[in-house]
C-alpha cells in the first residue's frame, strides 16, 4: 500500500514562524548587548541603565526589561561572553607542556580585545562580588583545570594543583583589578598576567 501521508503545510508554517521568532529574539538580545558595550566604551558602568540602553539600541524600555530585568543581568550576560571567549577552543584536558602558557596568552587576548568594556565589567563584578550574585570576571575554574592537567614538575609554587592555581589566581586578580582601575596599560597588564602565570620576576619576562 502506498504511503499517502504528506507533510502538513500548517505545521511547516508553524516551524518557520518559531524559527523566525527565535532568530529575532537572538538578534534583539545581541543588539542590546552590543549597545551596552557602546555605552560602556563611551562612559562608565554607572551610565548603563534600562533607559540609556533603550535609547542606544532604539527599543522601548519594556523590551529591555523583557530581555534583562535589571542592570545586573546585563553585566552578567556581558561577563558570560568574556568567560565563554576564554573557554573557546581551549582543549581540556591537555597534556601539552605549553598548556599553561597557551591559556595565559588566550586570556590576555580576550581581556584586552575590548579593554574599555572589559575593564568596566571587572569593576562591576568586583562591586557585586560581596552579594554573591554577580559572576566574577576571572577564569579561576579554567586555571585550576589547566594546572591539574599539566605535569607536577611544571606547576608553579606547589605540586598541589589547588595551591598552585590559587596562588596564580591571587596574582592574576591583583593585575586584573589594577588594570581595570587604570593603573596598568594593556601592555603592563599582559606583563603582570604572565608574571602570575609563571610566578617569576616580571623584569625577566
Enumerate the predicted regions with their spans.
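Amphipathic alpha-helical linker/stalk segments
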Residues: 78-103
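Short, well-structured alpha-helical segments
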Residues: 101, 105, 161-169, 173, ...
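Basic, helix-initiating cap at the start of DNA-binding domains
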Residues: 1-56, 73-76
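Amphipathic alpha-helical segments used for helix-helix packing
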Residues: 75, 110-134, 145-148, 177-178
